[in-house]
Structures are given as structure tokens and as C-alpha cells.
Amino acid sequence: MSLLSALTSISKPMNTSSKSSVSSKNVSGLSMGSNSIACGSCGGSYGYPGAGLLAIVDLNVNIDIDINLSATRSYSCGCN
């Protein structure tokens, strides 16, 4: 019985982490897509300092973090 309960407790966090990683990819993909439309042809670079950490956080927190990062994000574009 202890082995079964251990497997159940291990599988539950794995399911929640996979859900949060999928949702964070969607959020970051949308924000990066909108930025690339604005400056995609300029060959500019965009910095996402916390992009790797967003996969751990839930979708609601990701939206808040992405909005906060967009205010401090530095854009560098070659064409003005």
C-alpha cells in the first residue's frame, strides 16, 4: 500500500507541472509573436529574463509576470 500511495503522490505533481508548462508556453508564445510582428523585419533582439522560470508558475501568475516584464523589457531594433 505504501508503494501505491507513493506512486500516486509522485504522479500528481508531475501532472500539475506539465499543465503549467503548457500554459506558460502559450502565454510566452503569444507575447513573443506580437513583439515579432512589430519589429520582426528589423532583426532586433528581445530579452526575456524570466522565460525559463515561467514554466514553473501557473497561468494566472504568468500573465501578471509577462505584463510586468513587458514594461521593463528592452527593445533593440535596427530600423526606425
Swiss-Prot record:
GO terms for biological process: sorocarp development. InterPro entries: HssA/B-like_chaperone, HssA/B-related. Residues 9-29 have a biased composition (Low complexity). Transmembrane segments: none annotated. Residues 1-29 are annotated as: Disordered. Belongs to the hssA/B family. This is HssA/B-like protein 2. The lineage of its organism: Eukaryota, Amoebozoa, Evosea, Eumycetozoa, Dictyostelia. The gene is hssl2.
